[in-house]
Amino acid sequence: MKNGLSEILEEEIVGIHDAARPFVSKEVIGRCYREALNFRCGIIPVIEERNSVRILTAYENKAFDRERIRVVQTPQVFPAGLLKNAYETPYREEFTDDASVAEDDGIQIKLVEGDEKNIKITTPLDLRFAEFLYRDNLI
């Protein structure tokens, strides 16, 4: 990431996209870039969680209000200068994506509407679902 960012001017807007999400729409990309330009902060697309969720601790598990959960997608979009500074932070296991690195550096993260079809293909079942979406022109 640092090598790529070193080639980008500080005032540019940069998007980081997960190659495992091949169905990202022009609308989501445009929405993320517009918001990053307008607000000069980190922008990430999200969708609502529809499943019931539980929080686990070492001692118990409890139901958690899914209305407070959002599922993060890509692209994650930032002013390049902010992201360059954030990536000077030494790596930690808590960093799960670019937004978590940026947030740790004090960068505000704004959520925008994602797209359910912007699926992440990480398992054989995901791949079969993606093939179905593509074959039946549902994307």
Which positions does each model-derived feature cover?
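Residue-level signal for inorganic ion chemistry
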Residues: 4, 17-18, 48, 79, ...
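Conserved Class I S-adenosyl-L-methionine
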Residues: 110, 114, 118-120
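Conserved core of the sugar-phosphate nucleotidyltransferase
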Residues: 23-112, 139
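Active-site nucleotide-sugar/metal-binding loop of Leloir-type enzymes
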Residues: 2-13
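Hydrophobic helical membrane-anchoring modules
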Residues: 118-139
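Conserved strand-to-helix beginnings and helix N-cap segments that scaffold or border functional pockets
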Residues: 1-2, 26-30, 124
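Short beta-strand-to-loop acidic/aromatic patch adjacent to the donor-nucleotide binding site
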Residues: 11-21
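A short, conserved beta-strand element in the Rossmann-like catalytic core
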Residues: 20-23, 118
